[in-house]
Amino acid sequence: MAHNAQHLSKLLASSFKQAPPNTLPEVVISKIDGLVNWARTGSLWPMTFGLACCAVEMMQGYAARYDMDRFGVIPRASPRQSDCIIVAGTLTNKMAPALRKVYDQMPNPRYVVSMGSCANGGGYYHYSYSVVRGCDRIIPVDVYIPGCPPTAEAFVYGILQLQKKIGREQNLLTWWRK
């Protein structure tokens, strides 16, 4: 832990020495932005929205062999406590308003993971009259995990890709430049 603190202090010191005086606020804000994103990637609290067999693979990802807790991913039961929702399985027309309601109850910033071919595009039931052809028609999706059902390794990889995406965001810097 001390090594990480020393590395961070050296990185900050080198950034301040290289920055021209008029860009110093942008350097400070971008470093704060990076620190906030680092904290968000290390404490991702998803809400599981398991609708079919993909939810079983999602549960396996939280079990002892893959242990998503070591990545800081701890599932929550309430949408008000979570910052990510994992849609796993076949989304029907009757379930779509419930998904939208749960998504709207989540605080910002919020992220969506679509897990399995049924959640991605309807899957095996694509031509059924009662199936939504992809949950991205209801809510915006950040990461798609393919497969029928996707393996637990694919689930872990999808969560790691979401963490990379969160680490690249520049929310404060975009706000500052407005």
Swiss-Prot record:
Record keywords: 4Fe-4S, Electron transport, Iron, Iron-sulfur, Metal-binding, Mitochondrion, NAD, Oxidoreductase, Respiratory chain, Transit peptide, Transport, Ubiquinone
Gene Ontology cellular component list: mitochondrion; respiratory chain complex I
Binding site for [4Fe-4S] cluster: 53-54, 118, 148
GO biological process terms on file: aerobic respiration; electron transport coupled proton transport; mitochondrial respiratory chain complex I assembly
Domain of life where this protein originates: Eukaryota
Compartments, as annotated in UniProt: Mitochondrion
UniProt cross-references to Gene3D superfamilies, sorted A to Z: 3.40.50.12280
A GO molecular function held by the record: 4 iron, 4 sulfur cluster binding
Chief place where the protein resides: mitochondrion
SUPFAM superfamilies: HydA/Nqo6-like
Family: Belongs to the complex I 20 kDa subunit family.
Role noted for this protein: Core subunit of the mitochondrial membrane respiratory chain NADH dehydrogenase (Complex I) that is believed to belong to the minimal assembly required for catalysis. Complex I functions in the transfer of electrons from NADH to the respiratory chain. The immediate electron acceptor for the enzyme is believed to be ubiquinone.
Subunit structure of this chain's protein: Complex I is composed of 45 different subunits This is a component of the iron-sulfur (IP) fragment of the enzyme.
Name this polypeptide is given: NADH dehydrogenase [ubiquinone] iron-sulfur protein 7, mitochondrial
Recorded name of the encoding gene: ndufs7
